[in-house]
Amino acid sequence: MEPFLLLLLVLLPAIVLVRYAFTYGHRTSTMPIGPPTLPFIGNIHQITKKYTHIKFTEWAAQYGGLYMLKIGNGNMAVITDRRLVKEVLDRKSGIYSHRPHSFVSHDLITKGNHLLVMHYGDQWRTFRRLVHQHLMETMVENHHTKIVNAEAIQLVRDYMIDPEHHMAHPKRYSNSITNSIVFGIRTANREGANMRRLYKLMEEWSEVMETGATPPVDLFPWLKLLPQWLFNNYIDRAKAIGVQMETLYVDILNKVIKRREDGHNNGTFMDKVLDSQEKHNLPWHQLAFIGGVLMEGGSDTSSSLTLAIVQALIQNPDVQRKAHAEIDAVVGHNRSPVWEDFEKLPYINMIIKEGHRWRPILPLCFPHALGEDDWVDGKFLPKGTIVVVNTWGMHMDPSQPDDPAAFIPERFAKHPQLAPDYVPGTWERRDHYGYGVGRRICPGIHLAERNMFLGIAKLLWAFDFQPGEGPIDSDPVTGYHNGFLYCAKDYSCRPVIRNEVIRDTIEREYATATADVFSRFTEG
């Protein structure tokens, strides 16, 4: 062989490799800036596996409200700027409402039928439309609030008669509301079988969805060829979660179908979906998942936020005193707060908004994906870019007037309305981002607002929350579980009933709720 050809054969692969080393895994000059990258892997080595939102917030302080991470040769834009959230995720929602494909969550766990990870398209629109019809504000106001009010008085009674298990009571509360509305099957106590199965499932799914918990197979498909034991058997773990999920959802759906076969159509969400099956013709797996998804979304989020707020109340007795004074002046002790008291109890609304800000349940919004090329503030975002809204970073903005680490409800004194009222307004007026953004905003926002108001208002009406025997760690790292959902670790709590009149009122209202509301539902 000629020496020149031999040299060419040797140099050509080296030239190609060097070229890829300078391009693969690196940002182009037109993209937003970000942390320094390494050839081929980009920023993968720098993304923490735990409490990723805190690292993303540190980078936001260094690189600004929009920066780009390279995940291999893929792109991840992180937004920690309220103005950009409005201009990009809200105003351009048609191209920013997609989801990045996930081999683990989409293919292995949900088979693409979970509303949270579902790709943007006709199936998503059908699911969303069905959910909206049952959870729009008028439906919640006219049909669901009476259920919330009844479950909230049981929440108070549970704290009163069983303070030892205070961490479990908000979970029962939110799960029972959701299951009653969706299936007509309430959760009567903290030992409810459906609830226990759901929270076990959610805990395992949250862990596997945390950044870094599984190999980046969507960016490096060849990783699927490697033995899964190298990555903590992630395929088997994901499939097992999928089996748990499908089995639970199908079991509950079958109970609804059996009840209907016995001649009882209770007008629940699933009853209405089944009534419209001739029109929508949803496959069996989708039929099971549309109800299961609502059970998930309504159970874990409200309960986690309630636990965070109670924790904050224990550590801030002045906040409790102000709330007690407001409630006593409006409500008294012979009845508990009801939804009609909302406008007269603005401080309770401030406490809830501050809870959303202080410990958001989703510190990082579930990732969006860009459907086509876009330019944002003169920077290029290619089609397929993963877009992460850093809720934690926006809520903990150090430029705000009050200490972002402190629990100060008064920072929302100029936000007297419910969260949905601020979503369509200007970015300067948005209260918080606890329910997400754009077209992917939580479809149960109206129900969730009533869950939170009635739950927190009644708890504060009834109790003085004091420290129990044991630690109360509210640190955002050491005091909170790592995972996709952000929830407080167990903490001590001593709920002290405020007086005997309130105790008697609780028992009387609970008896009324049992007779008038709970009796309409089966238990599970």
From Swiss-Prot:
Classification via InterPro entries: Cyt_P450 (IPR001128), Cyt_P450_E_grp-I (IPR002401), Cyt_P450_sf (IPR036396), Cytochrome_P450_fung (IPR050364)
Topology within the bilayer: Single-pass membrane protein
A single GO molecular function term of this UniProt record: heme binding
Function (record text): Cytochrome P450 monooxygenase; part of the gene cluster that mediates the biosynthesis of patulin, an acetate-derived tetraketide mycotoxin produced by several fungal species that shows antimicrobial properties against several bacteria. PatH catalyzes the conversion of m-cresol into m-hydroxybenzyl alcohol. The pathway begins with the synthesis of 6-methylsalicylic acid by the polyketide synthase (PKS) patK via condensation of acetate and malonate units.
Cytoplasmic compartment spans: 1-4
Cofactor: heme
Expression triggers: Expression is correlated with the production of patulin. Expression is positively regulated by the secondary metabolism regulator laeA. Expression is strongly decreased with increased sucrose concentrations. This decrease is lost in the presence of malic acid. Expression is increased with pH changes from 2.5 to 3.5 in the presence of a limiting concentration of sucrose, 50 mM. Natural phenols present in apple fruits such as chlorogenic acid or the flavonoid epicatechin modulate patulin biosynthesis.
CDD domains: CYP64-like (cd11065)
Glycosylation-annotated residues: 266
GO biological process per UniProt: patulin biosynthetic process
Transmembrane segments: 5-22
Biotechnology (record note): Patulin was originally used as an antibiotic and specifically trialed to be used against the common cold, but it is no longer used for that purpose since it has been shown to induce immunological, neurological and gastrointestinal effects. Genotoxic effects of patulin with dose-dependent increase in DNA strand breaks in brain, liver and kidneys have been detected in mice. However, more recently, it has been proposed that patulin might also have anti-tumor properties.
Enzyme class: oxidoreductase
Compartment(s): Endoplasmic reticulum membrane
Keywords, sorted A to Z: Endoplasmic reticulum, Glycoprotein, Iron, Membrane, Metal-binding, Monooxygenase, Oxidoreductase, Transmembrane, Transmembrane helix
Parts of the chain on the Lumenal side: 23-524
Gene: patH
Phenotype upon loss of function: Completely abolishes the production of patulin and leads to the production of a distinct dark-red pigment.
Species annotation: Penicillium expansum (Blue mold rot fungus)
Name assigned to this protein: Cytochrome P450 monooxygenase patH
Enzyme Commission number(s) from the entry: 1.-.-.-
Coiled coil (UniProt feature): none
Similarity remark: Belongs to the cytochrome P450 family.
Binding site for heme: 442
CC per GO annotation: endoplasmic reticulum; endoplasmic reticulum membrane
Pathway note: Mycotoxin biosynthesis; patulin biosynthesis
